[in-house]
C-alpha cells in the first residue's frame, strides 16, 4: 500500500478527497485561535469573554459526534460529509458579521458542530480499504486531516493581512487584519468543497453494498450486560456538558435564570440518548431477539477504545491549548518563539498518526500495539513533567524540552492512529456510531483535562494570582496527571482489550476481497 499512497485513482482518490474534507473542517473549527486577540481587541471583549467563546468552540462537538455517527450509519458518509461542509458556511458568516459577544457565542456554538466531521471519514475510509490496510489508511486520513488545525494557526493571520485591502482592524503595531474576511473565507471554501465532494465520491466501491443497522436511534448492542455498559458510558457525556454549563455560568454568560435551563437541556439530551438506545435494543431487552455467536461483539471493546481516545486525542487538544504559554513561562521566551516551538507538537501529527496505523498493520497484533503506544504516551508525559524553570536552561535545555515534547507527541498521535485502526473492526455495520462515541470521548478528555489544568493552581494554594512557583508546580502536576492516566489505560489495553477477529483479513465479515481491488 505504501507505494500507492500518492495515487489519485480508485480507493486512494477517495482517501485523498476525504482527508482533505476533514482538513477543511479543522481549518474552520480552529479558525478563531490565531485571530482571537484581534477579535478581542476589535469588539472590546474581556479576557473572560474571549475564553468563553473558546469554550463554546467545543461545547456541542460532544453530542454532535454522537448524533453524526447515527446519521452516518443511516445516510452514508458521502451525504453526511457534504452536508457538514456546506453547513459550515452559515456559522462562519455569522461569526464574521458578529457585532457583540452574544452573537460570537451563538456562531461559535454552531461552529462546534463542524468539529464533529472527523467521525464521518472513519466510516468512508473503512468502506474502501480492507482490514489488513485499515491502520495506515485511517492514519493518513486522521493525521493529514488533523493538520488543518496547524494550517489555520500558521496561515489565517497572513490571510487576514492579505485581505486588509478591503478594510479591517488596525493593531497597535499599525498592521491591519481583516479577521472577518479570513473567517468568512474558510466557510466559503468549505461550502464549495462540500459540493465538489458530493459529486466526486461514492459511499462504497462499485458492487459493494453499504451495510446499515436496522435501527440508528442508538448503538446496537448484542447482550444485556453490554446494554447497561452502554448506558453507563453515556453518563460522562451529560456530566461534561454540565461542567461546560457551569463554566459558562462562572463567566457570566449563563445567568441565574438561564443556567438551570441549560442543565435541563443537558438532562433532556441524556434522556433522548437513553431512549434511543432502549428503542434500538428493545427486542434484546424483552428477550425476543438473541444474537448468534458469530454476530455478537463486546461493548467492552468500545469502552476501552473510548478511554484510549481520552488519553491520546483528549490530551492532545488540552496540551496544544496550553503548550505555547508553557514554553513562554518556562523559558521566558517571546510569544512568537514560544508558539513556533509549541507547534512542533502538532507537526508530528503528519507522520505519527499514519505511523501508528502502519505499526498496527505490520505488527500482527493490534491490541498489543495499542497498549504499547498508550504506555509510551504515559511515560512521555511523565518525562515532560520534568521540564521546569531552572531544570532545563539555555539553548541546550530548550532543545531537550522540544525533543521530549516531540517524542511524547509521537506516542500520543501514533496512539490515535492505532485507536482508529481498531474502531472499524469492532462491528462493521455500526462503525459510524462507534466512531462517534470514541471521538466524543476524545472531547470529553479535552474538556476534563483543560478544567483540571485551569483549577490546579487554585488547588495548590495559588489563589486568583498564583506565584511563578505555583504555576511551575501546577504545570508539572498537569503532565503527571496525563502520564498516570496514560499508564492506567495502557494497562487496560494489555489485559482487557481483545484482538478483533479478522484484524488482518482481506475483507470484512460478509464481504468479498475483490471489492477492495
Located regions from the model:
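Extracytoplasmic gate region of multi-pass secondary transporters
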Residues: 32-36, 230-263, 300-343
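Helix-breaking motifs and short loop linkers at transmembrane-helix boundaries and internal kinks
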Residues: 44, 76, 97-102, 114, ...
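Central cavity-lining transmembrane alpha-helices of secondary-active solute carriers
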Residues: 52-70, 343-356
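Primarily marks hydrophobic transmembrane alpha-helices of the MFS/SLC 12-helix fold
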Residues: 81, 104, 369-370
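Glycine-rich segments within core transmembrane alpha-helices of 12-TM secondary carriers
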Residues: 135-164, 438-450
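A membrane-interface helix-boundary motif in multi-pass transporters
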Residues: 161-187, 247-261, 454-486
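C-terminal membrane-cytosol helix-exit motif in multi-pass small-molecule transporters
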Residues: 187-210, 234-249, 266-285, 489-498
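C-terminal transmembrane helical hairpin of 12-TM major facilitator-type secondary transporters
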Residues: 366-418
Amino acid at each position: 500500500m505504501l507505494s500507492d499512497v500518492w495515487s489519485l485513482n480508485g480507493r486512494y482518490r477517495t482517501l485523498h478527497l476525504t482527508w482533505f474534507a476533514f482538513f477543511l473542517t479543522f481549518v474552520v473549527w480552529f479558525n478563531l485561535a490565531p485571530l482571537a486577540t484581534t477579535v478581542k481587541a476589535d469588539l472590546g471583549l474581556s479576557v473572560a469573554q474571549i475564553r468563553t467563546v473558546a469554550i463554546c468552540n467545543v461545547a456541542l462537538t460532544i453530542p454532535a459526534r454522537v448524533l453524526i455517527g447515527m446519521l452516518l450509519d443511516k445516510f452514508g458518509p458521502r451525504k453526511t460529509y457534504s452536508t457538514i461542509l456546506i453547513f459550515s458556511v452559515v456559522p462562519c458568516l455569522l461569526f464574521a458579521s458578529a457585532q457583540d459577544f452574544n452573537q460570537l457565542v451563538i456562531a461559535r456554538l454552531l461552529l462546534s458542530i463542524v468539529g464533529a466531521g472527523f467521525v464521518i471519514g472513519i466510516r468512508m475510509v473503512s468502506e474502501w480499504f480492507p482490514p489488513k490496510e485499515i491502520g495506515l489508511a485511517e492514519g493518513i486520513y486522521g493525521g493529514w486531516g488533523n493538520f488543518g488545525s496547524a494550517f489555520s494557526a500558521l496561515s489565517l493571520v497572513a490571510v487576514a493581512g492579505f485581505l486588509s485591502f478591503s478594510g479591517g482592524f488596525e493593531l497597535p503595531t499599525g498592521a491591519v487584519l481583516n479577521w472577518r474576511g479570513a473567517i468568512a473565507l474558510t466557510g466559503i471554501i468549505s461550502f464549495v468543497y462540500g459540493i465538489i465532494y458530493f459529486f466526486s465520491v461514492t459511499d462504497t466501491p462499485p458492487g459493494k453494498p453499504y451495510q446499515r443497522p436496522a435501527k440508528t436511534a442508538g448503538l446496537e448492542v448484542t447482550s444485556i450486560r453490554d446494554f447497561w455498559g452502554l448506558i453507563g458510558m453515556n453518563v460522562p457525556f451529560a456530566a461534561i456538558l454540565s461542567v461546560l454549563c457551569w463554566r459558562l455560568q462562572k463567566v457570566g454568560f449563563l445567568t441565574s435564570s438561564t443556567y438551570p435551563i441549560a442543565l435541563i437541556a443537558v438532562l433532556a439530551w441524556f434522556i433522548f440518548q437513553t431512549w434511543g438506545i432502549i428503542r434500538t435494543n428493545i427486542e434484546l431487552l424483552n428477550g425476543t431477539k438473541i444474537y448468534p455467536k458469530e454476530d455478537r461483539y463486546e461493548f467492552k471493546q468500545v469502552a476501552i477504545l473510548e478511554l484510549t481516545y481520552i488519553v491520546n486525542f483528549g490530551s492532545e487538544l488540552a496540551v496544544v491549548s496550553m503548550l505555547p504559554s508553557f514554553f513562554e513561562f518556562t523559558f521566558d521566551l517571546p510569544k512568537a518563539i514560544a508558539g513556533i516551538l509549541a507547534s512542533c507538537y502538532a507537526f508530528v501529527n503528519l507522520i505519527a498518526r499514519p505511523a501508528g496505523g502502519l505499526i498496527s498493520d505490520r505488527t500482527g497484533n493490534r491490541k498489543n500495539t495499542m497498549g504499547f503506544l498508550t504506555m509510551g504516551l504515559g511515560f512521555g508525559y511523565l518525562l515532560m513533567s520534568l521540564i521546569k524553570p531552572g531544570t532545563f536552561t539555555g539553548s541546550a535545555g530548550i532543545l531537550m524540552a522540544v525533543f521530549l515534547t516531540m517524542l511524547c507527541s509521537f506516542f500520543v498521535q501514533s496512539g490515535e492512529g492505532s485507536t482508529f485502526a481498531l474502531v472499524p473492526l469492532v462491528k462493521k455495520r455500526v462503525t459510524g456510531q462507534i466512531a462517534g462515541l470514541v471521538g466524543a470521548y476524545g472531547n470529553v478528555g479535552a474538556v476534563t483535562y483543560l478544567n483540571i489544568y485551569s483549577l490546579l493552581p487554585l488547588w495548590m494554594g495559588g489563589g486568583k494570582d498564583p506565584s511563578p512557583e505555583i504555576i511551575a508546580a501546577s504545570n508539572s502536576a498537569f503532565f503527571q496527571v496525563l502520564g498516570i492516566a496514560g499508564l492506567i489505560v495502557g494497562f487496560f489495553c494489555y489485559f482487557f482489550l481483545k484482538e478483533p477477529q479478522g484484524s488482518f483479513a482481506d475483507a470484512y465479515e460478509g464481504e468479498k476481497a475483490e471489492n477492495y481491488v
